[in-house]
Amino acid sequence: MPVLATPRLIALMENAALQAAAPALDEGMTTVGGEISVKHLAPSPVGATIEAHALLVSVEGRKLTFDLSAQQLQPADDHGGKLVGEGTHVRFIVHRQKFLDKL
């Protein structure tokens, strides 16, 4: 069916969390996903504009917890629109090279 697939919605929401965390990280550091829980609430046609948001709600050492949401923007909307997904996501701060060396 020509609709937004749940894995694509999750990828958009995870990327929003990645981008939200990035400005606060020291050089050489990044985050990796550890857990995600998403509800796909409404269908969206292929080609619709989807805006994903991540709000950092908790920091426990290296563990970052985000509330996630995604909206389908309506034509001429600047923000908001139909809520198509929501959830939570946990990311962990890691040293990029040390993490890659373990692969």
What are these regions (language model features)?
Residues L12-A16, H53, E86:
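Residues within well-formed alpha-helices
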Residues P2, K39, T88-F92:
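Generic structural detector for well-ordered beta-strands
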Residues P45-V46, L55-L103:
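HotDog/MaoC-like acyl-thioester-processing domains
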Residues L18-E51:
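Hydrophobic beta-strand-centered segment that forms part of the acyl-chain substrate-binding groove
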